[in-house]
Amino acid sequence: MCEFPINYVEIEHVYSQTIGAGYRTVAITSAKQGEGKTSLIKALAKRARLSDKNVLVVELNTFNPTLSAKLREFPDHGKTEIISPKQQGYNLLPAPRNIQEIMRYKETHVLSEAINDWLESYDCIFFDTSALQSLNQSNIPPEIVCEVCEGTILIIEAGNTPANLIEEGIDKLKTRKVNLIGSIINDKSNPSLLSELIRE
């Protein structure tokens, strides 16, 4: 996973269009896995902390729970609880492992109630979702998470994400009447100008 410096102008632009614009709950999703959702969330959470915001990151990506990966070595004691990872500057609700908890988060009203409770203690909440095309029985559908958030950002990997997956993902979000704040083009797979000039 790539770590973005929080002083990148791109991070500042995304922050100003989300938390800086008054959004308190923001879901980050993508058309397919590996497009950079988690890296962006970590950078935005750290940026929000610099503005003295009390930040919660909720990992609902049960397909590939990157943020919770280190926690997997510890036994599961039932209900998932919020933790404060050292040196992160934000609190984290790890991805649920208990099937009953996963099924509850698939219910819009349950997730909405949880968000209302969390907002009593936190200034802003970022949601790390599964990719829109990740179909798995234990996934929490990302379009449900996006629906209950005030805004959503869609990440697309340039040169790697097929157009049909992007269209299908946007259609899923439209069907749920999701407030799509915008899209971010991740150009990590695009060749640099120098390499293109050398190739020519």
Enumerate the language-model features and the residues they cover.
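Conserved catalytic-core segment of NTP-binding enzymes
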Residues: 106-124, 129-200
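Short boundary/hinge segments that flank catalytic cores
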Residues: 1-35, 62, 66, 160-200
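P-loop/Walker-type NTP enzyme "switch/lid" segment
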Residues: 2-5, 12, 16-17, 29-34, ...
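Short coil/turn connectors at secondary-structure junctions
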Residues: 23, 52-53
